[in-house]
């Protein structure tokens, strides 16, 4: 794998290959690095921010919420992971999958902002998609948590409404070996005084 930064003519596959090589670990939970880079980018999201966590059913819940909001006439951004076939599936604006060009533009911005801060693939791509949404003047954003909640990159967003679909034993190496420990991690997507759905 190439570790050199993609040049201005690089396509999305070249960027994705590069992103797999810039951090020593595939999963490195924590928000310090992500917040530091986010502070160098304009990630101000307009509209209502929904965050969805849980062991199972996150993607389905996000898709249903997106569908309801679109049917009501709102401009909606949807971020889910992982993707099934193409990376672009992770970011949708008004039901349309983000283009390669739109994603590459955001990757270039995150790369310029991060300096020497090492980010995981998920952290880097999360920041890029949040920046895409911030520039899209959306009425609502639906964000799926990647792993857990408390230390997941998506949790840098101050959600207006947080949803936890279910809690079960999963990713026990990172989240704990009991439902209580896993629930503690996931509950950190809730915000004081704001709607919490479970």
Residue locations for each model-derived region?
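Hydrophobic/aromatic beta-strand patches that form the interior of the parallel beta-sheet core
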Residues: 50, 77-79, 161-163, 197
């Amino acid at each position: 794998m190439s570790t050199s930064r993609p040049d201005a003519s690089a396509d999305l596959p070249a960027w994705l290959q590069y992103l797999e090589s810039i951090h020593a670990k595939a999963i490195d939970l924590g928000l310090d690095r992500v917040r530091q880079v986010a502070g160098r980018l304009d990630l101000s999201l307009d509209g209502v921010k929904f965050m969805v966590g849980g062991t199972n059913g996150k993607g389905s819940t996000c898709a249903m919420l997106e569908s309801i909001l679109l049917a009501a006439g709102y401009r909606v951004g949807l971020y889910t992971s992982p993707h099934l076939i193409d990376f672009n599936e992770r970011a949708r604006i008004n039901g349309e999958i983000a283009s390669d060009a739109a994603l590459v533009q955001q990757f270039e911005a995150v790369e310029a902002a991060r300096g020497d801060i090492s980010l995981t693939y998920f952290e880097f791509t999360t920041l890029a998609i949040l920046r895409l949404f911030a520039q899209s003047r959306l009425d609502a954003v639906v964000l799926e948590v990647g792993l857990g909640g408390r230390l997941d990159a998506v949790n840098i967003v101050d959600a207006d409404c947080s949803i936890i679909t279910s809690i079960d034993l999963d990713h026990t190496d990172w989240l704990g070996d009991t439902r209580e420990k896993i629930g503690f991690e996931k509950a950190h997507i809730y915000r004081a005084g704001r709607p919490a759905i479970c």
